[in-house]
Regions:
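NAD(P)H dinucleotide-binding glycine-rich loop of Rossmann-like/cofactor-binding domains
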Residues: 71-78, 88-154
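Glycine-rich phosphate-binding loop and adjacent beta-alpha segment
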Residues: 189, 227-300, 334-335
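N-terminal Rossmann-like NAD(P) cofactor-binding module of classical short-chain dehydrogenase/reductase
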Residues: 94, 151, 198, 220-221
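Short amphipathic alpha-helix with an adjacent loop that forms part of the alpha/beta core around
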Residues: 204-215
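Mid-domain Rossmann-like dinucleotide-binding core that forms the NAD(H)/NADP(H) cofactor-binding site
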Residues: 123-202
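C-terminal hydrophobic helical "lid"/dimerization subdomain
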Residues: 1-2, 278-335
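Short glycine/proline-centered loop/turn elements that form peptide/ligand docking sites
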Residues: 82-86, 177-187, 201, 205, ...
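Glycine-rich beta-strand-centered segment in the early N-terminal region that forms part
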Residues: 29-46, 56-99
Length: 335
């Protein structure tokens, strides 16, 4: 049986993930059967949700990784051998068997990517699950309306940078982001069109937010949770909305705020809604048309931080979780 190099979970991480929590090993490649194709992966996505799946607790929307078993996630690759009519050799495809150099994929759960619409990396970022998450969190979840003030936490990362740009392109009146570091904040304002960016590492977020959004916030797109979430509730408008996309602060060492802050949700009559993007698949064609159009006209900045080689995937994930990336975090596996 053929095998491929793959990233395996070496142990359950502590509160802070380190690169040695994973290791590179091999996994078997199943035989090619009708409806399947062998893909050489070119790029794979690094996502905060990967860290959550390393814990043993049950998740309601996906499966958790087993110690000694391979990781998986979104990837882009080229078909090198095929027993599927819809997947000719040479086609570029997006699928869910990343974290390995080769994969046998089922044509029923694969997206064939049009490289005339966007480059391969964009199909993992602005046109991938990253962009789709931002789009869903703003529209069906967040109910964004023209002229509103939007706050995005974790705005220097993949989903956050897309959420802020999408909000601007969809007609938001003011877009404020939070990010860790002066470089990220400058990029958000100068390149991505944010009106203001708060450097939470060098300033007090709770003090700076009312200055950045003096009329208070209509919609808060939260990727971070923790103290930023708690502080933002004090700057929400009456009947404001919160789209809860993630809580990456849970994976760090910082103490978490008391749930007593949720009284602000009562006093301000807030709508706080968590979401999983796969619940909105019926929206994907609209999303791809609209975002593809923005890419074609140059209205959208799609930046990636790329780590080279499967052996560096663990370090890349550790960097992502510590906020080292600017925009989308990817691993390049092959040309």
């Amino acid at each position: 049986m053929k095998q491929t190099a793959a990233v395996l979970l070496a142990r359950r991480p502590g509160r802070t993930f380190v690169a040695d929590d994973v290791t590179v090993g091999t996994v078997d490649l199943p035989a090619l059967t009708p409806g399947h194709a062998l893909v050489r992966n070119q790029y794979m996505s690094l996502d905060p949700s990967t860290r959550g799946r390393m814990d043993p607790g049950e998740k309601q929307y996906t499966t958790n990784f087993e110690v000694g078993g391979p990781l998986d996630g979104s990837a882009i690759g080229v078909v090198v051998e095929s027993a599927a009519d819809s997947l000719p050799v040479g086609a570029t495809v997006r699928h869910r068997l990343g974290w390995r150099e080769y994969a046998v994929i089922d044509e029923a759960v694969v997206t064939v990517c049009d490289l005339d619409t966007a480059p391969a990396t964009a199909w993992l970022s602005s046109l991938g699950q990253t962009g789709f998450t931002a789009y869903a969190g703003l529209l069906p979840v967040g109910q964004l309306a023209a002229g509103e003030t939007v706050l995005v936490s974790g705005a220097g990362g993949a989903v956050g940078s897309m959420a802020g740009q999408f909000a601007r392109l969809l007609g938001a009146g003011r877009v404020v982001g939070s990010a860790g570091g002066a470089q990220k904040c400058a990029w958000l304002v100068e390149d991505c069109g944010f009106d203001h960016a708060i450097n939470y590492r060098d300033s007090d977020f709770a003090t700076e937010l009312p200055k950045a959004a003096p009329g208070d916030i209509d919609l808060f797109f939260d990727n971070v949770g923790g103290w930023q979430f708690a502080s933002a509730l004090h700057s929400m408008k009456i009947h404001g909305r919160v789209s809860m996309c993630g809580a990456v602060s849970n994976f760090g060492t910082q103490d978490q705020p008391s749930t007593a802050v949720l009284i602000e949700a009562v006093l301000r009559r807030l709508t706080i809604r968590g979401f999983i993007v796969r619940d909105f698949e019926d929206l994907r064609p609209q999303f791809e048309r609209q975002v593809g159009g923005w890419l074609a006209t140059g209205a959208l900045v799609d930046r990636a931080t790329i780590v080279e080689g499967i052996e560096n995937a663990g370090a890349g994930l550790a960097g992502l979780l510590s906020g080292a990336n600017l925009g989308k975090a990817l691993v390049k596996l092959s040309d």
